Amino acid sequence: MKTIPSEVRCSRLCPACTNAALRLPRNAGRALIWIYRHTLSPLVGFNCRHLPTCSAYGDEAIARFGLWGGGWMTLARILRCRPWGTSGIDNVPVAKPSGATWYRPWRYGRWRGVNAK
């Protein structure tokens, strides 16, 4: 059995390992969206009322703001995408919405309107 020299082994607080651990929830959320886009979405049909589609919006929101913030943004978007709901171009915000913190997650989402301020 080979032993790995101590200078090659990852230390306990290695920055690369820490960053990988912090990206794990984000990547798991994006993986779920990828699975939906390649399995269920083709069966149901591509019929989103917004541009970009809700799954593309969710993927971008989670990539930009993490699973917690991006997940709340995606939930708000899915709730707006219904009959008699909003439609049109609705991009992911560039910056985090004002007042959005981890303990006030509802502030991440735009619950009414498209591109509302």
UniProtKB/Swiss-Prot annotation:
Which Pfam families does the entry link to?
A: YidD
Places the protein is found: Cell inner membrane
Question: What species does this protein belong to?
Answer: Nitrobacter winogradskyi (strain ATCC 25391 / DSM 10237 / CIP 104748 / NCIMB 11846 / Nb-255)
Cross-referenced InterPro entries, in alphabetical order?
Answer: Membr_insert_effic_factor_YidD
Alphabetically list the UniProt keywords: Cell inner membrane, Cell membrane, Membrane
Looking up PANTHER family in the UniProt record yields:
MEMBRANE PROTEIN INSERTION EFFICIENCY FACTOR-RELATED
Q: What is this protein called?
A: Putative membrane protein insertion efficiency factor
State the function annotated in the UniProt record: Could be involved in insertion of integral membrane proteins into the membrane.
Q: Which family does it belong to?
A: Belongs to the UPF0161 family.
